[in-house]
Amino acid sequence: MLPEIQDCPEGAQMIDPKLFKFDTLGLHAGQQPDPVTGARATPIYQTTSYVFKDTDHAAALFNLERAGHIYSRISNPTVAVLEERIAALEGGVGAVATASGQAALHLAIVTLMGQGGHIVSSSSIYGGSHNMFYHTLPRFGITTTFVDPRDPEAFAKAITPDTRLVFGEILGNPGLEIMDLPRISEIAH
């Protein structure tokens, strides 16, 4: 027999981020007690698919007319709690969790840059990022000029009217070159 618990309306935000401090938000933001079991901790949902009430409900979800989960590669309840918690901790309106840093970088670039966009990047970056800039992004019409991260003026010279992103890593991979971030930021602005 399942225990009785307090009613918690579907979709209710149990923690108002404005009322709590960082530690409390880190533990509880974005979640609510399980309405069936009363469990406090967020479970790890290992499902890939979800049940729909009817075809109208499914259509509304797929047409983005209603919030909800349709397939775990896109969203799931466990990841939704993580996203809501990060947004609360950062004071943001939302967050997007990705499967890797590479996925996050790709998502940010293709979301913010259009075809014909240009990137000026340090030549000393993670190999996966270099491959994305050199091989993948050109297929989207996005080009990259690689420059020496130790030379801020190289960044300035490489900027064109189509430049939309200046990219680098504070400690470049693999040589651990240190960028002059204040100067490069000044150039980028």
Q: Which residue stretches match the model-derived regions?
A:
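A glycine-rich helix N-cap at a beta->alpha junction
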Residues: H135-T136, F140-R150
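N-terminal "arm"/small-domain region of PLP-dependent enzymes with the aminotransferase-like
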Residues: C8-G11, I15-N76, E84
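Buried hydrophobic positions in well-ordered alpha/beta secondary-structure cores of metabolic enzymes
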Residues: G38, I86, A104, I119, ...
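Conserved PLP-anchoring active-site segment centered on the Schiff-base-forming lysine
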Residues: T111-S129, V147-D148
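Short helix-loop-beta connector
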Residues: E90-V93, M113-G116, P161
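Active-site phosphate-binding strand-loop segment of PLP-dependent enzymes
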Residues: P149-H189
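Conserved N-terminal alpha-helix of the aminotransferase class I/II PLP-enzyme fold
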Residues: D54-H106, G128-H135
